[in-house]
Each structure stands twice: as structure tokens, then as C-alpha cells.
């Protein structure tokens, strides 16, 4: 712990090694019909896991720490996008922190930890949206910010019985099975959980297009956060592009940046009350996306990542044109200029998102967090 002008500066952010160790927590991961014991060493996941570990290492590097991190209102150092931004200029700094992380994967990993930070930071700025579970929201904001936890999300019901009511799909769709003083037990299937196998926890909710029947489908109106090693939670992975890649030289992207997608099976999973954000509340479950601020924040992360990817593509294209001697052709330069213009457009859009934010002055901690 350090003191900066009498202000706390507590650093509990995971290192790369701590992140890799956190994946070997007893979680139930299955791929090709086999249960995986060591995620960080398995050939289907190890390179992508180590790509993420580089992001965590960068948070502690002296040359990049001040660019990527800051101290939140509680005195804990965290990634700038994991905390609410009190001004447009601070949000622009968060954009630059996103870009710095994204450059480590050339913009090709879309669901890095800062993606879900677009949501978790709002838990700190507007916890009362989740009343009577507002203390849970604050708890999870603090947990994710202090450790810079890697969350995935799982929102979609399996694509079966689409013509039937949600209540008639109880044997498949995720729902509350039992309630006790300690928490709830849930059962069912959710998809598609991108990078679930290499993340720390999953955020579970319903897709924004879900239509509930009031008085009949309250058991399905849920929103909670769950560690990936929760008992009876099974992670069923698609085939691994990383495992089938010959080498980083032959397959430079799929060999290192494969964000494996999973189906999550909740086979009687216990969820403590402190992990619950919405429970049997159709109105809140229905309005969560528009009310929480996540829809406002996540485009900044995804747009910044695309801008970084465009940097890479433009640079690669210029090298190709130089190598084959066509870089001086006027028609080729015109086409190249079109692509560079798209690159410039993306950077301009992300800057505009930061400096012309939505008015969120009703929130207790941030004028622009939503």
C-alpha cells in the first residue's frame, strides 16, 4: 500500500501469474467429451490464457501502469475502465487504457476483461438500480475493480421451442428451482459464454429481447454473478481453433487469440444471496439493459478495439504494398486512403463518445458512467 498526497493507493490487481493460477480452481470444463484438469496448461486454452495474462502483467509494468490504471474512490488502484468516470476527460483516459490493452492482442480479442467492465463499473455508480440487492451490486463492483476480475456473460436461452412460452421450457431454460435463507438454487442451460473457460466469473441474465408473462414466468427473471468454479456448474466448450492451429507462425491469430465459446449447464447450482442482483422481478429484468448503462458503455470498449485493429490492418497493408512495389501507384494509394479514413473515423467516434457523454448526473458517483 502506498500513500499519494494522503490518498490511499492500494494495489490488489491480479498479476499475470495470479490470473493463470485463478483458472485452476476446480471448475468443471469439458471439451471433446473429456473433463479438463488444468485449463492454463491444456493445448486447447493455454495460449489464449497466456495472452490474457499479458494484459494483467501490463497493469503492473512501470511504463504502462499510470496510463492503464488509476485509484478509485475507495483508494484501490484498478484499470481505468473498471471504475466510473467523473468527467469526459477521465473517460477519454479510460479509452486510452482500453486501447493500450487492446494493442497487446492487435485488437483481435473482443471479450477481454475490460469488455464486461462496461457493466461492472455501473454497479459502483448506480447500485440502487438493483434494490433491494444494492449492497450486492456495490460488493461486486469492489470485487471486480480491486482484482480486475475477468467476467464473461451468458444471456441467451438455447434455440429450442422458440414458439413456446418461457414457462413451458422449464426443463431447459434457466430458472429458480428453490429458495432458502442462504440463497437460491437454479437449474437450466444458458449460452453463449465467450471465454467462460478462461474467466473468473459469469454474469447471468436474460437476453434483452426476452418477453416474460407476468404472473407466470417470474422464476426466469434472474440476474446474478457466479464464480466459474461453482459446484454443479458445467462448462461445455466448442472445438478449439487454438488446438488445431499448427503454430503461431502458421496461424498467428487463432493459435493465440481463440476466445472459446461455451454452453453453461446449471445442474442445481446454489447462488448465495450476496451474488444476486435481480430476483423474480420481471420489470427490472426487462429494463436492465437500458437502465444499467451497459448499452452506453460497451460500445466504447468494442469501438476502441476496432480502432486498434484498424491500426494493425492499415500498417500490415502498407507493408504488403511496399513489399510488392505497388505503394506508389495512384489507384492503390486511393484505395489505401479509403481504409485509413475508416481507421480515422473509428478513433474519432470513440473520442466523441468520451467527450459528448450521456447525461448521467442523477447517478451518485459519475456524470458519464452510463
Q: What are the language-model segments listed below?
A:
Residues 153-302:
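FAD-binding core of flavoproteins
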Residues 5, 29, 292-301, 326-333:
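Short, charged, low-complexity loops and linkers
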Residues 14-26, 277-288, 304-316:
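Acidic, low-complexity proline/glycine-rich segments
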Residues 46, 50, 142-145, 308-311, ...:
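Generic structural signal for well-ordered, non-transmembrane alpha-helical segments
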Residues 57-151:
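Internal helix-loop-helix
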